[in-house]
Amino acid sequence: MSASELATSYSALILADEGIEITSDKLLSLTKAANVDVEPIWATIFAKALEGKDLKELLLNIGSGAGAAPVAGGAAAPAAADGEAPAEEKEEAKEEEESDEDMGFGLFD
């Protein structure tokens, strides 16, 4: 991450912490006050990406909200098929061995 991106990220966090709307002008003024040269495009990108979003809420829900749904949904399916899965794997392994022999590409045939 470049210094410009990092400075703009920190500026967005400062604005969110103060409850101020995140705009490109405010991001640029904060980075300018910190004596960091940031191209205006970075401020615009960050402002548009965070527009209408609650940054505090996003940060608080990173671990719990995004990861919880896939884990809960993915855990139920394998638990139901535990009894059948090993038998299927053994059958597939036997089929793979047989298919190698049938092709006749062995080095020592």
Swiss-Prot record:
Subcellular localization: Cytoplasm
UniProt cross-references to CDD domains, sorted A to Z: Ribosomal_P1
Acidic residues: compositionally biased ranges: 94-103
Gene Ontology biological-process entries: cytoplasmic translation; cytoplasmic translational elongation
Pfam families associated with the record: Ribosomal_60s
A single MF term (Gene Ontology): ribonucleoprotein complex binding
Biased composition range(s): Low complexity: 69-84
A Gene Ontology term for the protein's cellular component: cytosolic large ribosomal subunit
Disulfide-linked positions: none
Disordered as annotated region, ranges: 69-109
Main location: cytoplasm
Function: Component of the ribosome, a large ribonucleoprotein complex responsible for the synthesis of proteins in the cell. The small ribosomal subunit (SSU) binds messenger RNAs (mRNAs) and translates the encoded message by selecting cognate aminoacyl-transfer RNA (tRNA) molecules. The large subunit (LSU) contains the ribosomal catalytic site termed the peptidyl transferase center (PTC), which catalyzes the formation of peptide bonds, thereby polymerizing the amino acids delivered by tRNAs into a polypeptide chain.
Assembly: Component of the large ribosomal subunit (LSU). Mature yeast ribosomes consist of a small (40S) and a large (60S) subunit. The 40S small subunit contains 1 molecule of ribosomal RNA (18S rRNA) and at least 33 different proteins. The large 60S subunit contains 3 rRNA molecules (25S, 5.8S and 5S rRNA) and at least 46 different proteins. The acidic ribosomal P-proteins form the stalk structure of the 60S subunit. They are organized as a pentameric complex in which uL10/P0 interacts with 2 heterodimers of P1 and P2 proteins.
Homology family: Belongs to the eukaryotic ribosomal protein P1/P2 family.
Further remarks about this protein from its record: Yeasts contain 4 individual small ribosomal A proteins (RPA) which can be classified into two couples of similar but not identical sequences. Each couple is distinctly related to one of the two A proteins present in multicellular organisms.
Record protein name field: Large ribosomal subunit protein P1A
Organism for this UniProt entry: Schizosaccharomyces pombe (strain 972 / ATCC 24843) (Fission yeast)
Phylogenetic lineage: Eukaryota, Fungi, Dikarya, Ascomycota, Taphrinomycotina
Gene name of this polypeptide: rpp101
